[in-house]
């Protein structure tokens, strides 16, 4: 089992546990160049809000690339604002098998500071 398979296995386990909670899910995906965040509905069928460093508005505010903690902080603030605008106050945090460290942690902390509860 390689590194990616292990990450996907962890992600599957997390998503099964979150599905039992029946709450909205904040999913994070990380690549070398970008970070993506999506808020899914309680049943997991609809994307209620999304934000990423690939968006034009975010790229204007970034002075470097989208693969750093400053960019993740900006995406965390934007996803919290969009989720609150969609009427979502509390979510379950789905780190998609990534370690809660660095960019993933920066995004989560920024979303919490912007008023999203998880």
From Swiss-Prot:
The keyword Nucleotide-binding does not apply. GO terms for biological process: translation. InterPro entries: Ribosomal_uL18_bac-type, Ribosomal_uL18_bac/euk. GO terms for cellular component: cytosolic large ribosomal subunit. Disulfide bonds: none annotated. GO terms for molecular function: 5S rRNA binding; structural constituent of ribosome. Gene3D superfamilies: 3.30.420.100. Pfam families: Ribosomal_L18p (PF00861). Keywords: Ribonucleoprotein, Ribosomal protein, RNA-binding, rRNA-binding. It comes from the Bacteria. This is one of the proteins that bind and probably mediate the attachment of the 5S RNA into the large ribosomal subunit, where it forms part of the central protuberance. Belongs to the universal ribosomal protein uL18 family. Part of the 50S ribosomal subunit; part of the 5S rRNA/L5/L18/L25 subcomplex. Contacts the 5S and 23S rRNAs. This is Large ribosomal subunit protein uL18. It comes from Ralstonia nicotianae (strain ATCC BAA-1114 / GMI1000). The gene is rplR.
């Amino acid at each position: 089992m390689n590194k990616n398979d292990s990450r996907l296995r962890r992600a599957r386990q997390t998503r099964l546990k979150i599905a039992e909670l029946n709450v909205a899910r904040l999913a994070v995906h990380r690549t070398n160049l970008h970070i993506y965040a999506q808020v899914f509905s309680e049943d997991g069928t609809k994307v209620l809000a999304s934000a990423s460093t690939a968006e034009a508005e975010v790229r204007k505010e970034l002075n470097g690339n989208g693969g750093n903690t400053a960019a993740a902080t900006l995406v965390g603030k934007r996803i919290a604002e969009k989720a609150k605008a969609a009427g979502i106050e509390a979510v379950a945090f789905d780190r998609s098998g990534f370690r809660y460290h660095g960019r993933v942690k920066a995004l989560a902390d920024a979303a919490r500071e912007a008023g999203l509860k998880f």
